[in-house]
């Protein structure tokens, strides 16, 4: 027998539906994602920490869940909202239904609500806090819980999802019949800051010949430089970048070292802050797998995967920071680079997962920057000996 559930937004909007996950209640910032597929990657993306995700595509769960399509070791989204959960799931890799997966991972979730109406509210009023409650339902209590969550602005969540200790990553991307391929040859030593890093980012770096040392969010620049990296990667992650003063300070020191630096998502925003710019909260952010972005260097347009609620404020950027990519949905900054050194970043997700791989070339750009830096060092050494 299905158990009733409700979703209550901080503005008082109430949606009645059916529980498809764990019992109890959950609170978080309610956002909408327009991707048609990839619900397992979305649920396990650390960038969704403290967020309740609404999937706008009506049928979610058709292919079940599996052991491979995870972006972290557990679910980070605070809750899930969908229109319809199919009675059957089918896929040759499937090991569990979405319902069982949500219950196993203790995720509170609701189905059978009008996600179209909900999305219009979030679009028109902006992302807002909400509460999903199952079983013994108390609308007044749910509204109180939603209002108590507050805003994402000012929340430093990166240190909450970051690894507690340094570890090495060598696994490449998944291949049919082979699984995840271990990379035994490494040309580059990369230190990756974990602000909530997605596994597919690490896989794509490993596949390009990188031995990756993943370090906690609060690792000092001195500790990173002591590892003698060829390049430094700044990962994606949840929350507001501005309170992450420990990361901004470390990045400023790392910029002075002139080592190649590449940032994605939160890492992009932190690079912008470290370079002297500012960030600001967006109304409802970008969450989806079909966002057109223009590369201003080539004028080419790419379809990208996006997941962020904050953006770099273009008007605040100093003269040595150049905008390289722009969203064709709202003209927001999607990429920057520093004119005086090898440091660049991208707001969307080149690693996709889920989504298109149109901008995977940015990983190749990072590889080329490290190769150039190493050749330059070698030339300098030879010239002086």
Swiss-Prot record:
Pathway in which this enzyme or protein is active: Amino-acid biosynthesis; L-arginine biosynthesis; carbamoyl phosphate from bicarbonate: step 1/1; Pyrimidine metabolism; UMP biosynthesis via de novo pathway; (S)-dihydroorotate from bicarbonate: step 1/3
Enumerate the Pfam families for this protein. CPSase_sm_chain, GATase
Q: Which InterPro entries match?
A: Anth_synth/Amidotransfase, CarbamoylP_synth_ssu, CarbamoylP_synth_ssu_N, CarbP_synth_ssu_N_sf, Class_I_gatase-like, CPSase_GATase1, GATASE
GO biological process terms on file: 'de novo' pyrimidine nucleobase biosynthetic process; 'de novo' UMP biosynthetic process; glutamine metabolic process; L-arginine biosynthetic process
Q: Which UniProt keywords apply?
A: Amino-acid biosynthesis, Arginine biosynthesis, ATP-binding, Glutamine amidotransferase, Ligase, Nucleotide-binding, Pyrimidine biosynthesis
Protein family (similarity comment): Belongs to the CarA family.
Query: Which protein are we looking at?
Result: Carbamoyl phosphate synthase small chain
What species was this sequence derived from? Pasteurella multocida (strain Pm70)
